[in-house]
Amino acid sequence: MGGPKKEENPPGGGPTSLFILTEDNPIRKYTRFIIEWPPFEYAVLLTIIANCVVLALEEHLPGGDKTVLAQKLEKTEAYFLCIFCVEASLKILALGLVLHKHSYLRNIWNIMDFFVVVTGFMTQYPQIGPEVDLRTLRAIRVLRPLKLVSGIPSLQVVLKSIIKAMAPLLQIGLLVLFAIVIFAIIGLEFYSGALHKTCYSLEDPNKLVKEGESETPCNTDNILEKATGSFVCNNTTSMCLEKWEGPNSGITSFDNIGFAMLTVFQCITMEGWTAILYWTNDALGSAFNWIYFVPLIVIGSFFMLNLVLGVLSGEFSNERNRVERRMEFQKCRFRAMFQTAMVSYLDWITQAEEVILAEERTTEEEKMHIMEARRRNAAKRKKLKSLGKSKSTDTEEEEAEEDYGDDGYLKTRSKPQGSCTGFWRAEKRFRFWIRHTVKTQWFYWFVIVLVFLNTVCVAVEHYGQPSFLTEFLYYAEFIFLGLFMSEMFIKMYALGPRIYFESSFNRFDCVVISGSIFEVIWSEVKGGSFGLSVLRALRLLRIFKVTKYWSSLRNLVISLLNSMRSIISLLFLLFLFILIFALLGMQLFGGQFNLPGGTPETNFNTFPIALLTVFQILTGEDWNEVMYQGIISQGGAQKGMIYSIYFIVLVLFGNYTLLNVFLAIAVDNLANAQELTAAEEEQVEEDKEKQLQELEKEMEALQADGVHVENGDGAVAPSKSKGKKKEEEKKEEEEVTEGPKPMLPYSSMFILSPTNPIRRGAHWVVNLPYFDFFIMVVISMSSIALAAEDPVRENSRRNKILNYFDYAFTGVFTIEMLLKIVDLGVILHPGSYLREFWNIMDAVVVICAAVSFGFDMSGSSAGQNLSTIKSLRVLRVLRPLKTIKRVPKLKAVFDCVVNSLKNVVNILIVYILFQFIFSVIGVQLFNGKFFYCTDESKHTSAECQGSYFKYEEDELLPKQELRVWKPRAFHYDNVAAAMLTLFAVQTGEGWPQVLQHSMAATYEDRGPIQNFRIEMSIFYIVYFIVFPFFFVNIFVALIIITFQEQGEAELQDGEIDKNQKSCIDFTIGARPLERYMPKNRNTFKYKVWRIVVSTPFEYFIMMLIVFNTLLLMMKYHNQGDMYEKSLKYINMGFTGMFSVETVLKIIGFGVKNFFKDPWNIFDLITVLGSIVDALWMEFGHDDSNSINVGFLRLFRAARLIKLLRQGYTIRILLWTFVQSFKALPYVCLLIAMLFFIYAIIGMQVFGNIKLGTVENSITRHNNFQSFIQGVMLLFRCATGEAWPNIMLACLKGKACDDDAEKAPGEYCGSTLAYAYFVSFIFFCSFLMLNLFVAVIMDNFDYLTRDSSILGAHHLDEFVRIWAEYDPNATGKIHYTEMYDMLKNMDPPLGFGNKCPNRLAYKKLIRMNMPLDDELRVQFTTTLFALIRENLSIKMRAPEEMDQADMELRETITNIWPLQAKKMLNLLVPPSDQLNKGKLSVGKIYAGFLILESWRSTRFGQLDSGMPMLELQDASRHPSQESLTGADAGHLHPGHSYMNGHRRSPSLRHNGSPLARSPSPRRRGHQYIHHDIGFSDTVSNVVEMVKETRHPRHGNSHPRYPRGSWSASTSPARSPSPSRYGGHLSRSKRTQLPYPTYGTTSLCQRSRSPSPARLQEMRERDRLGYGIDMGVTHVQHSYPTLASRRAGIGRRLPPTPSKPSTLQLKPTNINFPKLNASPTHTHHSTPHSVHSLPHHRDLLRDPRDMYYSSRERERDRERLRDRDRDRDRDRLHEYDLRYEYRDRERELYERERDREREVERERLEYIAPLSFEQALAMGRTGRVLPSPVLNGFKPKSGLNPRHSDSDEEDWC
């Protein structure tokens, strides 16, 4: 078991065991063999199971008594211990104890085993005694079987998904724990010691006075001093004293942090929280308590605990996908292997056949035989394929039969010969006839009707039915059974058994009929029925076959069957879990539940009862009650609190984790099923389309034959219906759009034409902009009036006044209705008034109100009409629904709910059918068995007569009570009652009582005996698994999926998904954060600021908060005075420290900047509150009644919230939390409407019921006597707190309130209570609260999805880091700082510091944000570009980017119409910002990419004597300095230096339109000659590089005039002043302490750095051919091309979506190396941005521009001679890096190449260089053919320092 696999520890060389036995030792070898021998493992497992059985058989008696069996079983303990000891010893010998890898105690299971064995020995010695009963630890051994379980694949999915979910679950656990701590501390401050006062008798001060059956906390004796809503003792009989231990024996309290946390946890699980709320109300008054409890339930239960569900379902679907993909891959691999083998085999056979056929000796007959065999094989293969298709569903009826043609069928039958031939032929015909009959429609419907009638017969059975009905049903059962049996046999005969059993429906029929036969025999022999025959009702599901829901239902069934293994494995896991906890519970609590009122029904005394108790806790119902009993049994609140851990773990792991996996499976399957259905529907649509097209072709060909026309109409229908749908959608859209609607062109009510002035007036009024607003106001006022009514005193003055208001409101609504009818017409034409649902509702409400007023006025026969009037007036509550239509977003949520209901319909039908089946089984099992006598000693109605004495606990004399024989409130006497009972059970409320009653049920008309038939619990367990665990979850899942689909459907038109939308949402709302910093660094303010923002200070404050939290947790009830004072002064100290922090922050930031940060405001409020609180504690005790300052204590707990902003994961969780709250307002509004409507109905119908004691459920805490009370009661029901009891308390026949002005003998309440509560629970539990779950699952899906996908939760980090670079929140930073920032941000948001520069450049080229004049990027633009690039939002090939931009702008305008006006140009910069003479990030980084690529070639890394261009080693400076430094401005278009009258062709002044780097803006010119933006950028980037080794000399070449050309100059360009003329000469004269930048203008670089060429360049430098320093240059004139004057520059084509690389040969351009983050130091030399020469220009010598041919020739000769002279001396220097095989040949080729280069003429421009070519060098390892044919080939391998060859693996 615990041993590792054999290969883990290779024998021989391994470590010794126990320092003695080596790997080769025979003892160790044998022990190793034994522990790895499978029979040994099974033996150990069997021992474990036997041990579990022994533990389960024990019965625990009170007082440590033992039964005879238990004593015998105890003796087995030694044997078990012995076996486990032997196992442990063998393993220790074989594996070693602990010191080395894979040794015994390095395995978690082995540690557990060892622990159990050691503790087992301890228990064998009696002197340890029963105090430390360590046998409990033996239950841990039950975990061992889990090891084998992990081998089952489907269980692995469940287990793995739970284990994988543990990481996010722990995050959520932290959040929940944090919430619990905060609420517990608040509870500790407010409620500590509050629940210890109760009423004591005046006669006996030690005797408690109860209210009803339980004690109640009290507030005071003096009725004048009492707080509103609190409880006051009756001062004639009792007094309020503070000496009670508290409710639930003192366990439920806030007396110290432990009790408080347990109480808060209990509230979060929504069990028993109302009791705590009511107790605190009694003790302290009801004014403010709800403010504590309602948020606790909403945040704790609805939100935090639902997160668990979201995480689990996400993980489950991920894990299942993973497993499915793996299986799919394995199948594919096997299939491929099989196919290759098969194909080769078939080829071999076919070739053999060909040979045989070709042979001369093969006879014709043999050939025919071979051909026939081939034909048969082909046919068989075809049939197999078709069968495979139809079989996949496995739910079709006898579809497959058609495949078996008559011939095949006949051939399979053996035909007997002889005299019987005629008989067999007749039999065959008869069989065919029957077969056709069975398949007809009428036979199908006949069977369905029979099933329906049978179901009706089953359903009419009820308790106390007349004997004739019993007899009729008895015989009907036989008749139906006979009919169904004959149907089964007829089908079997007609189809043959094989085909019959291929249909799953038929298999099901057969099982049900067999079950019914068994049941009939059983009831004859033994009596009693199981109700199995009702399973026939499931056959009604066949009706679905004729409905449109069939495919979706079938797919759901398929999907569920597919995940059956997961479900079964989950159930197995659940069973193991229950088993372990039941055994553990028996060890801990067995025989201990001996309470004053006797042993409770839930206990751990025997194994079956323990299992049921654990199952009950697992369902979450009344788990707190069991926990109270457990704690009390172990010594009460003082000693037994540690035992609460058992129950908490059980609830957390069982209820919240395992049971939520059911929902996870359901969500997953439904999504799966819906995909299947959608795919099928698409297929059907496609087929229809194809048919339609074929038909059209036929019709064209045949000129519309009659038949074809009919078919055509039929086929066209679907597309028409589609058109209709689209029209409807369009109509709806039109309605939503603003602006006046045109008048309908029909006459209204046959009288008013469209031109009629009355109608036009009505139309004008209805369409007034404020008309709807006015109606909304009236609706709101009317709703307030409804809520303000007094339901008890109907004729009170308040009600009379409100009645007059009601007349006014009804008048307004009537006028509105009449105006709309005049405008729209009544009903006859499209668009008329009653054609819309909302208008019908309006009309009904108005008419009913008018009718009820009519009755009121007439006053005739008031008595009989009262209920009618009341029901008519109740309809007024529908008025608030009128607002739904008027608020578009609310209507969207409402539509979503309605749609999810529509989706649920088909499941709802199945659900009701299953509910019905269980109800019928319940009626069969428990019919008439739920009666009891109020005197428990009597067991029949005959005995239950007269009176009996009832003894109360504290009373001296018994009470006399009447004996009454009555049924339980929930029973199974008829199907309707059974369905109600099961509905209550399924909501999980009060089901343990129903379970106890069922197990105690004996026989019909007899009383209960406790645990009479424990096996009846199986019915409930099965029901729970089918319903709450499963069906309800499918329901919830459907609503969740529909809700999510609705949200996604809205976005489909815009072609962006949900995640993209939430990211864009964030971008639109995001603003840069301001981070203040004092300007003067020498001030005191700056020093304070430095302290306040430093990390140590932050940590110090964190530590303070943590210690402060611990201090708050140290408080407890009844603490000593000294202790209390210490706490008070320490608290003051903390308050002082926090005050100092706040003061320091105000000094450091200044008042104005301090208040800009919301956290600072929060701190200030907290500090001020704490100071007031401290002062009040010290000085304010004199006059306690003046003002209630209790709320000030909240500020102590508020500091904890500051902890939340520290952790990254917690920050993200919280951020998402807030986001989900933002998504909820309309959902909450809808829920509020539901509550409002139900509360008003409740007030009207149940408001006058008399308030009773606690047992009655309608009490002073819990009633409908005011609107607020009604809403609280409904909120309680929504959390599921004992709603069935409230429903029973509202039924007809309840006593009326004393103030209700009812006639004597008149009763209140109504039978409507059933419908009212059931519908409310249905809407609330299934619909509304699931919207919460849907929203949460939507928002928190990032917890389980791939973390590399960018989500909105990452973007907060961008805002935070941006603030570090842009502390003043200007919204702009320099592009170099932007690069740094993105490198500092981790992926998926930024690039990360490990991202290769080249990949970063490519991303930036695609992002391409525009730059302003100071080369800064904008905040919103950068964030949006980042999101767009990361999530590929409309990113396309470069040439399509313009179109994509336009589409994206349109999408943004559609989805965010309001924000788009302001933000659109920031989000998607318009083309003119990227085109017209403006720089963009894409252009700059395209230049850097070229440099980077050049650097990675062999010539970028030359270590020769040539001037080496190295990486600029400049560190980043703040943007303010870099932009305002004296010499700043490398790429600043504005800093061009003028020389004389000439101006530089800088970006500012050039009119050439620039191309946008990543996307082209073509304007009709096919060839546009040059691109200033990009080329200027490249040239300037190049010039930024520092010349290091060889500073150039100031003298120029004597032969050439002084008029150098910049990188951008060419004969066709405007004249350029010297870039370094004036400025550099000045810098040289002033002897600056830093080296100046030399030019690296491309034109002055060689074509190919061959050794000779390098030498030539050096010589040229010496002679002064290069750029001169400090010398004024003379301008030379030359002809300018007309096209240039026109301002048409060559455009640079786009970068593609995957940026291609520049096809400038790396050997052609000597680029300098550049810094990864191209930031410049502030002592850089300014220059203007010039443009790059045409790519042809790059290939020529700069001097060629003004050489004569003779001069050129002379120079060439001179250089050639010099080369030859010096080659011998210089060659070894280059041979270090380049090897030439043939020196002579190399020299010859060099000469030839130089000749060709020099002679080449540049007569015309060629087509522009494409960006694919231009950036070719950005691609790694891709080398293009060199234009210089000199035999130099760059090395394909890159220098390891600069290698980006694996760049795609980064980022």
Curated annotation (Swiss-Prot):
II repeats lie at residues 427-670. The chain crosses the membrane at residues 39-57, 76-95, 108-128, 134-152, 172-191, 289-313, 442-460, 476-495, 504-522, 532-550, 570-589, 643-667, 768-786, 803-822, 835-853, 867-885, 905-924, 1014-1038, 1094-1122, 1128-1147, 1156-1174, 1185-1203, 1223-1242, 1309-1333. Residues 1306-1348 are annotated as: Phenylalkylamine binding. Residues 1604-1619 have a biased composition (Low complexity). Expressed widely in the embryonic nervous system. SMART domains: Ca_chan_IQ (SM01062). I repeats lie at residues 25-316. This is Voltage-dependent calcium channel type A subunit alpha-1. It comes from Drosophila melanogaster (Fruit fly). The gene is cac.
